C-alpha cells in the first residue's frame, strides 16, 4: 500500500534483497496485514483516527503531515491501521439510518438504502474514483526525474476516504437538520441552503483530494486537481438560477431505489 516505491531499489549485502525484506515491501503483504488488522479492534488506534477526522475539517494539512511522518518511520504513506475506515463506516451507517428516518422510510426500506449507500455510493464509487486518480496521477503527474516512483492504489484510496468523510458529514448529517423544514420546501431559501451545502461538501472533497496528491514530493502540477472548482461554481450558480434543488433530486433518487 505504499504510494511511492522505487522500481530500482538499492541492493543489500550481495546485491539481492532478502526474501523477508522483499515480502515486507510487497503490496500483497501490506494488504494482508491491513485486512488482518481489520478484525482486531484492540490493535486499532481509534483515538488517533478520531483526531484525523477532526483535523480533516479544521486543518487537513496536518493530517497529511502525519502521512509524511508515517513515510519516515514506517516507510509507507498509506495507513496501516484500519481504524479510520471502521469509524467512517460507523458514521456512514448511522447517518444513513438518520436519512431513512427523516425521509419517513420503513425498516426494510432503510436497510435497502443502507446497503445501497454502503456498497454503491461508498465502496463502488470509491473504488472507481481511487482507480481513476491512481491512473491519472501515475500517467500524467509523476515528475520526469522521478519515474522510478509511482502512486500506489492504496494511497489513492486513502486520499478518497479522507476527502469523503467531510462530504459525508455535511450531506448525510448536517443536512438532515434542514431537509424537511427548509431544503424541501420548494422555496428559494430551500434550494439556496441545500445547494450551498452541496457546494461546500463537494468543494471540500476537491480540496482534500488536492492536498493528498500535492503531499507526494514526486508529483508535479497537482494544482490541476483544483480545476473542478470552476465547473462546480458554475453549476451552483445555474442551479440557483434554474431552481434546481440538488437535495430534492437526491431524496427522490433514494426513494426510487428502495421501492
From Swiss-Prot:
InterPro entries: UNC-50
Annotated function: Involved in the cell surface expression of neuronal nicotinic receptors. Binds RNA.
Protein name as catalogued: Protein unc-50 homolog
Bias type Polar residues, positions: 1-17
Modified residues (N-acetylmethionine): 1
PANTHER family: PROTEIN UNC-50 HOMOLOG
GO BP annotations, alphabetical order: protein localization to cell surface
Keywords tagged on the record: Acetylation, Golgi apparatus, Membrane, Nucleus, Phosphoprotein, RNA-binding, Transmembrane, Transmembrane helix
Modified residues (Phosphoserine): 6
Amino acid at each position: 500500500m505504499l504510494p511511492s516505491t522505487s522500481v530500482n531499489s538499492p541492493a543489500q549485502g550481495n546485491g539481492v534483497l532478502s526474501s523477508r525484506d522483499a515480502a515486507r515491501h510487497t503490496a500483497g503483504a501490506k494488504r494482508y496485514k491491513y485486512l488482518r488488522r481489520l478484525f482486531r479492534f484492540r490493535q486499532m488506534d481509534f483515538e488517533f483516527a478520531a483526531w484525523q477526522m477532526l483535523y480533516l475539517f479544521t486543518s487537513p494539512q496536518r493530517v497529511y503531515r502525519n502521512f509524511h511522518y508515517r513515510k519516515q518511520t514506517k516507510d509507507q504513506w498509506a495507513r496501516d491501521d484500519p481504524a479510520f475506515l471502521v469509524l467512517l463506516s460507523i458514521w456512514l451507517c448511522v447517518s444513513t439510518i438518520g436519512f431513512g428516518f427523516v425521509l419517513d422510510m420503513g425498516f426494510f426500506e432503510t436497510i435497502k438504502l443502507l446497503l445501497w449507500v454502503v456498497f454503491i455510493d461508498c465502496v463502488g464509487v470509491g473504488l472507481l474514483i481511487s482507480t481513476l486518480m491512481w491512473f491519472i496521477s501515475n500517467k500524467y503527474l509523476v515528475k520526469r526525474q522521478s519515474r522510478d516512483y509511482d502512486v500506489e492504489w492504496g494511497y489513492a484510496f486513502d486520499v478518497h476516504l479522507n476527502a469523503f468523510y467531510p462530504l459525508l458529514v455535511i450531506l448525510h448529517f448536517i443536512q438532515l437538520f434542514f431537509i424537511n423544514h427548509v431544503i424541501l420546501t420548494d422555496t428559494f431559501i430551500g434550494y439556496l441552503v441545500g445547494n450551498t451545502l452541496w457546494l461546500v461538501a463537494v468543494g471540500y472533497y476537491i480540496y482534500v483530494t488536492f492536498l493528498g496528491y500535492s503531499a507526494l514530493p514526486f508529483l508535479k502540477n497537482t494544482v490541476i486537481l483544483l480545476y473542478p472548482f470552476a465547473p462546480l461554481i458554475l453549476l451552483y450558480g445555474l442551479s440557483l438560477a434554474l431552481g434546481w434543488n440538488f437535495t430534492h433530486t437526491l431524496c427522490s433518487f433514494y426513494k426510487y431505489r428502495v421501492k
